[in-house]
Regions:
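A metal-dependent hydrolase signature that marks the N-terminal structural subdomain at the beginning
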Residues: 1-73, 90, 169-181
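Long, well-structured alpha-helical subdomains associated
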Residues: 2-4, 14, 137-181
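Hydrophobic (often cysteine-bearing) scaffold residues that line and stabilize catalytic clefts
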Residues: 16, 96, 100, 124
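Helix-hairpin-helix/helix-loop-helix acidic hairpins
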Residues: 82-89
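Short helix/strand-bridging catalytic loops that position acidic/His residues to coordinate divalent metals
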Residues: 90, 113-122
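Active-site recognition of the HExxH zinc-binding catalytic motif
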Residues: 97-114
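An active-site-proximal "capping" alpha-helix that borders the catalytic cofactor pocket
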Residues: 122-138
Length: 181
């Protein structure tokens, strides 16, 4: 792996380096060309952002600048906040998948901003979102345990149900907006 992982956070996460390597193994190596490091810190240290944005921003991509290669920052205090046991249990259980989503989104930003041609700035967000969904699906199938293997035969029906519920939700929102006017 040619992406360096630096941990500069007071939050200790078990097997963080190994998890990052497994996540990056899903992505083709050509997409990581020029992406030098991922820094894990407590908060994103960007002076141009307000304190409120820094406290809630999970990650930030720094594109290639003069004399500096592309790199990324991940805020572990946003992904795994220090709370009492019952509140932090859910965030700890979903930390691996949240970490995968964040890292894949950073790689997608790097790929579409530096390596991919033909993507306009107004198409960047949708392209990154589809990239993350595609690679996250591959990661989940590779890393998923018993639950993923048990639910795989039912996935088409569950996806169909999710689409149907999403359309009903949109119709309901449209009806509410029309009734407000």
């Amino acid at each position: 792996m040619n992406v360096k992982v630096e941990i500069a956070s007071s939050t200790q996460v078990k097997n963080l380096h190994a998890n990052v390597e497994r996540i990056l193994s899903i992505v083709p190596q050509e997409h990581l060309r020029g992406f030098t490091k991922i820094v894990f810190a407590d908060l994103v240290a960007e002076p141009r952002l307000s304190a409120v944005q820094r406290a809630s921003l999970p990650a930030l991509y720094h594109p290639k600048m003069l004399g500096q290669m592309a790199w990324a920052e991940v805020a572990l205090s946003v992904l795994a906040p220090k709370k009492k046991f019952p509140q932090s249990l859910l965030t700890r259980l979903s930390l691996k998948s949240s970490l995968a989503q964040v890292i894949l989104s950073l790689v997608a930003q790097h790929y579409y901003m530096t390596l991919s041609k033909g993507i306009k700035k107004n198409q960047l967000e949708t392209a990154c979102r589809s990239y993350v969904e595609k690679h996250f699906e591959r990661w989940r199938e590779k890393e998923g345990g018993l639950r993923v293997r048990l639910l795989k035969p039912f996935k088409p029906q569950l996806d169909k149900l999710a689409r149907k519920l999403a359309t009903k939700y949109k119709e309901e929102l449209d009806r509410k907006q029309i009734s407000k006017k």
